């Protein structure tokens, strides 16, 4: 099915600009054999550019498929270069938004590496929300994780920063998701 509206703003002026045929539907999944790898289901991808808001998305995204699977592994914390990059981003956010000793929520925190980096630098507390979080991955008493999708109730958690890094590409109804976050925060900005 070709999605004809931008999932971020609803605009219908979409230009397809890049196509990949027969791409595996899972990325970052570890498998035990060549046969298992070759058996991964495949779909076509067509990237579309929204002329209204600039959002780029897969116009052929199949909303009936659960794109998360056992064996999902996105760990990059073993790379010194990547961790230096995360440290620079973390320090910049903490300085720019005066987050020393503050609470930070990361929606779509994955394994919690970025949130852990933020909290190690700012000395505050971190709350991660992600259905794919693996319990026990982080060993920091200043971190708390909710292994679930972001819900309206999460907006009641007091925090000075809510961030969402490498998450929107996993959510097809982007506008609805962002509106949920906005609505859940009430009068807070």
What label would you give each PLM region?
Residues 37, 80-82, 148:
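Short, structured secondary-structure boundary patches
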Residues 3, 43, 47, 79, ...:
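Generic detection of long, well-ordered alpha-helical segments
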Residues 1-78:
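N-terminal juxtadomain amphipathic helix
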Residues 32-33, 79, 151, 173:
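Helix N-cap and loop-to-helix transition residues
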Residues 75-89:
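Conserved SAM-binding loop and adjacent beta-strand
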Residues 91-189:
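Conserved SAM-binding loop
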Residues 16, 70, 84, 88, ...:
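Charged/polar, solvent-exposed surface patches and flexible loops
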Residues 1, 88, 176:
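Short, conserved clusters of charged catalytic residues that mark active-site
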């Amino acid at each position: 099915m070709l999605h004809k509206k931008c999932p971020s703003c609803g605009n219908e002026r979409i230009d397809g600009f890049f196509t990949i045929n027969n791409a595996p539907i899972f990325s970052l999944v570890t498998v035990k054999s060549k046969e298992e790898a070759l058996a991964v289901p495949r779909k076509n991808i067509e990237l579309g550019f929204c002329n209204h808001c600039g959002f780029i998305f897969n116009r052929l995204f199949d909303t009936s498929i659960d794109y998360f699977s056992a064996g999902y592994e996105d760990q990059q914390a073993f790379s010194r270069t990547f961790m230096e990059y995360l440290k620079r981003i973390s320090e910049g956010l903490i300085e720019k938004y005066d987050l020393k000793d503050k609470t930070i929520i990361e929606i779509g925190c994955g394994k919690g590496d970025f949130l852990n980096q933020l909290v190690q630098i700012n000395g505050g507390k971190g709350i991660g929300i992600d259905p794919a979080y693996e319990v026990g991955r982080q060993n920091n008493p200043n971190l708390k994780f909710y292994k679930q999708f972001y819900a309206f109730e999460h907006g009641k958690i007091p925090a000075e920063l809510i961030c969402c890094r490498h998450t929107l590409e996993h959510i097809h109804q982007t506008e609805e998701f962002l509106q949920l976050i906005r609505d859940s925060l009430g009068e807070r900005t």
